[in-house]
Each structure stands twice: as C-alpha cells, then as structure tokens.
A protein has these predicted regions:
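Mg2+-dependent phosphoryl-transfer enzymes with acidic/Ser/Thr/Gly-rich catalytic loops
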Residues: 33-34, 38, 58, 220-305
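Non-catalytic pre-domain segments flanking phosphatase-related domains
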Residues: 1-47, 239
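Conserved acidic, metal-coordinating active-site core of Asp-based
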Residues: 136-247, 251-259
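Short active-site oxyanion
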Residues: 72-76, 96-98, 181, 242-244, ...
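Short, structured coil segments at secondary-structure junctions
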Residues: 95-96, 104, 205, 259-260, ...
Length: 305
C-alpha cells in the first residue's frame, strides 16, 4: 500500500473502470476543431481532486503530463493553493519547466529549471472582510498568503496549511497586509452551514469566494479567477482558444472549465461543477485526468496510448 504523503482530497469511492474505456470516451468528447498539433494546445490541471492522491500522482498522470510537454503542449498547474503549497507538488510531478497559476489565478508563476518565479500577482488589502466574517462565523481562523510568508490568526487544524514559514499574527496585521488570498477555516462547522453563511455576507458580492470540500474558503479580489489568469497566459503564449483544456473538480474550477474549449469535470465533482463541463471523466483515484491527457496525445498523434 502506498504511504500517504500529501494532504489532499480523500478518495471518492468511485468504482474503477477500464482505462481504455475512459480514454475512448475522452477521445470521442474532444471538439471536432481541436488542434492536431500539440504546440497549439494548453492544458490546465487543478491539483487536489484532479491529479494528486494522498500517495502522489499516478504513473498514468505523470505519463500524460510529460508526454504532452515533450510533444510541445503547454501543460500547467492551476490551483487554489498558494505557491508554498504548490512547490512540493511540482517536485512530486518532476515539473521543472512551465507555468503554474496559484491562489486561484491571482499569482502567475514561471517554473524554469525547477526554480519558481512570480511573474504577475493580484493582491488586495483584506481589511473589513475579516471583521465581517469573524463576527458571522464563530471560531473561524484565517490565513493570509503574502509570498513568501504565511500569516495565521491561529493554528490551523491537522496542519492543513502547507509550508514552513508560518507566523501567528494579530488580526490588525492580517487586515492591513496586502495578499493574493485569504483563507477562512471553521473546523467545527459543517460545510453546508459555512457556505450558507458566507453566501449571505457582503464579502460574497465584493470578492470572489470559493468554498472547498470542507468548511474552508478561499477569498480573492473580485474578478480574479483561474479563468482570468489562464486567458492572460493563453494570450502571452499565443495558443489558439480552440486548443484550451481545463480539468478540475471544485467550485473554484467552474470559471476555467467554462473558459476552456474543452472543459472537463472530474468524477468526484459535484453536480454544480459537472453542469458547466463539456465532459465528465473518472475520479482522481481512477486516472480521469490521465485519460483526458492521453486522449489529447492520441488526437495530436504523439506517444501514449
């Protein structure tokens, strides 16, 4: 049995299916005008619930990422994680060159020779939203991600915040420090109640709020999503819109799934996420993302199944 090394989404319990069937379904779902040249393809991959299991990435996922990249496709990571949480995943993927979108699109990172450099970043001063949320969500704790620091209002449960440079600071310091993302965690509240409360607050109209698979929310500047970050990068790289692919499972992936020419929801995605997708693949533990990548390789006539 593989040793668990990563804190990520637990298994969905989805029944396994033959990989060849998943590959054939993904191949059939690709748009008719999808490019046949890998150099005209951009594939954006979410991390948690998409390419990462607690034991790491599967061999098929690694084959897909490196097979596409070797063929000339632009394969990038698009995660809600801060850069500090993305770096260990890049290491596990042996992802040494390319691009990563962190903080749900607020932070664009160039990866070169295994070194990460922030190229663009959108920040905001959280100020009043912290007071509003703290009053409405009793017992909530906060994290702010101004690279390279991680500022916490109190320790997070189960070491849920990645990275080693944690500092417990006052709410005043959190409120006044520019950041690309604020995390809110309410460990003693169920997800549905947490989501309901946040949706009723002004912050849900003045900022982007993404609730995860637990009572955890990422808060970004209004208008900053994975889709906005990807569109900026697509234009920078000169990739045609018809060659864009996005694969994810969470509500923070909806924008990029809608943006892509081929938007894919994972098998572990909720009905809300699936409704925005062109195709639904298998869950992360059943190599759903790998099937999509191998289907693109097949369409482009490069190595793979």
């Amino acid at each position: 049995m593989s040793q668990e090394r990563f804190l990520t989404v637990p298994s969905t319990g989805e029944a396994a299916r033959p990989f060849e069937d998943l590959l054939d379904e993904a191949s059939a779902a690709l748009p008719a005008d999808f490019p046949t040249s890998a150099g005209q393809v951009l594939v954006a991959l979410d991390i948690d619930g998409t390419i990462l299991t607690p034991a790491g990435a599967t061999p098929r996922v690694l084959e897909g990422i490196h097979g596409l990249a070797t063929a000339g496709a632009h394969v990038l990571i698009a995660s809600g994680r801060a850069l500090e949480g993305v770096i260990p995943v890049l290491g596990a993927l042996d992802f040494t060159d390319g691009w990563a979108l962190c903080n749900n699109g607020a932070t664009l990172v160039r990866v070169s020779g295994g070194t990460c450099e922030i190229v663009e970043e959108r920040t905001f001063v959280p100020g009043p939203i912290l007071e509003e949320i703290a009053s409405a969500v009793p017992g909530s704790v906060f994290a702010s991600m101004p690279h390279p620091d991680i500022l916490l209002s109190a320790p997070f449960p189960n070491n849920e915040i990645e990275g080693s440079d944690h500092r417990i600071v006052s709410m005043e310091e959190l409120a006044s420090t520019p950041t690309p993302k604020i995390v809110v965690r309410a460990a003693d509240m169920d997800r549905e109640e947490f989501d309901r409360i946040l949706s009723s607050l002004d912050v849900s109209r003045t900022h982007e709020v993404f609730v995860g698979w637990t009572s955890w929310a990422d808060i970004e500047p209004l208008g900053v999503t994975k889709a906005t970050g990807l569109e900026s990068l697509r234009a920078r790289l000169g990739v045609p819109a018809a060659g864009t692919v996005a694969v994810g499972d969470g509500t923070n992936d909806i924008a990029m799934i809608e943006w892509a020419a081929f938007g894919v929801a994972m098998g572990g995605a909720s009905d809300e996420v699936r409704a925005h997708a062109n195709h639904v693949t298998a869950a992360v533990e059943n190599d759903g993302a790998a099937a999509v990548m191998h289907a693109i390789m097949r369409r482009c006539g490069v190595g793979g199944r």
